[in-house]
Regions:
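C-terminal active-site subregion of NodB/CE4 polysaccharide deacetylases
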Residues: 30, 47-155
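Short acidic, glycine/proline-rich loop/turn micro-motifs
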Residues: 10-11, 46-48
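Active-site beta->alpha N-cap acidic-glycine motif
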Residues: 1-33, 66, 71
């Protein structure tokens, strides 16, 4: 994960975590993987005005295009925070956007508010097997409820 220019100090939420280098991202792109945007400075986009959001989207797309050779087609909202304004602006820059909402995306999903599965929940063999199971949607829904309760208890 690249969150800032090389040599910049760690962001608090990334302290001690390894990030991919631009070279590694370039090799992943060459191997056929898409490199998506996560913005330039990882702000809460819901607190920015339209110009600030646009600058984050434009800056990240330009940096990725310059370093990897192709602009980002997808976005992962920082912190998973999004609202109507961020979704509207995302449409102008990206083909789709992922939230931090836990769930399974389907054909009827809003492509600018895609739910996703965090692989953290599938690190054990028993839960990993759910990825190919018809029970995946139910499992994701239960995990989503538990996660929402946990987040509310933190406030």
């Amino acid at each position: 994960m690249i969150t800032a220019p090389a040599g910049s100090p760690d962001l608090p939420f990334m302290r001690g975590k390894r990030r991919l280098t631009w070279d590694q991202l370039g090799r992943l792109h060459e191997a056929g993987m898409e490199i998506g945007s996560h913005t330039v400075t990882h702000p809460d986009l819901t607190r920015l005005d339209e110009a600030g959001i646009a600058a984050e989207f434009e800056g990240s797309r330009a940096a990725i295009a310059d370093r990897v050779g192709a602009p980002a087609a997808s976005l992962a909202y920082p912190f998973g925070f999004y609202n109507g304004r961020t979704r509207t602006l995302a449409r102008a820059y990206f083909d789709c956007a992922c939230t931090a909402d836990l769930g399974v995306a389907g054909t009827s999903s809003d492509v600018y508010a895609l739910k996703r599965l965090e692989m953290h929940y599938f690190r054990h063999a028993a839960t990993f097997a759910l990825l190919a199971s018809p029970r995946l949607t139910q499992y994701a829904a239960v995990r989503g409820v538990l996660r929402a309760v946990r987040l509310r208890l933190r406030c």
